[in-house]
Amino acid sequence: MNYDVIIIGAGPGGIFSAYELTHRAPALRVAVFESGHPLSRRRCPIDGDKIKTCIGCPTCSIMSGFGGAGAFSDGKYNITNDFGGTLYEYIGKKQALELMRYVDEINLAHGGEGTNLYSTAGTRFKTVCIQNDLHLLDASVRHLGTDINYKVLQNIYEELKDKVTFFFDTPVTAVAAADDGYRVFTAAGEYTC
């Protein structure tokens, strides 16, 4: 099967790449290959009672699947260049912050509305830190919480599922350059873009 774009991985980078492509170039045929499960099928067997530790599932539902490793996190999104990544080194601090705010807007539009945005800037706590020679990094943090984070991811998936072809439980085994694009190999077959 041939696609215009193939994305490997349905973590945040893959999800937002697919989101942008469907909004900016809706005619493109986009496929996303993910080694893990759809969000609705991601379940870890650890229950704290019968199963207390990792049993080494062939596909880890905590680390893999739609939403990536952060799907079941507490949904904190940092909007800062001071920590958490180095995107600003490639595109500049202003544009990096603009992109972080853009992602925040998408999250809000997909179920995150009503959540709080916290900031360390201008707080009494920051003043106390400075008085004690401690240096608190400035950041705005959107705290969605685990349940709302899941809801946001599910809503984004619902928006994308009819515009993007998702291949879940389909690890990519190899990628090779071709004369007119790339060949992507899985156990189920070969795909091109």
Segments the model singles out, each with a brief description of its role:
Residues 1-3, 187-193:
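Core beta-strand elements of the Rossmann-like FAD/NAD(P) dinucleotide-binding domain
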Residues 144, 168-182:
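A conserved short coil-to-beta-strand element within the FAD-binding core of flavoproteins
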Residues 71-72, 167, 185:
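A general beta-strand register signal
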Residues 38-42, 46-163:
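Conserved N-terminal/central alpha/beta ligand/cofactor-binding core
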Residues 1-13, 31-33:
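Beta1/beta-strand and adjacent pyrophosphate-binding region of the FAD-binding site
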Residues 17-21:
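Aromatic pocket-lining residues of Rossmann-like dinucleotide-binding sites
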Residues 27-34, 39:
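Short beta-strand "acidic-cap" motif of Rossmann-like dinucleotide-binding folds
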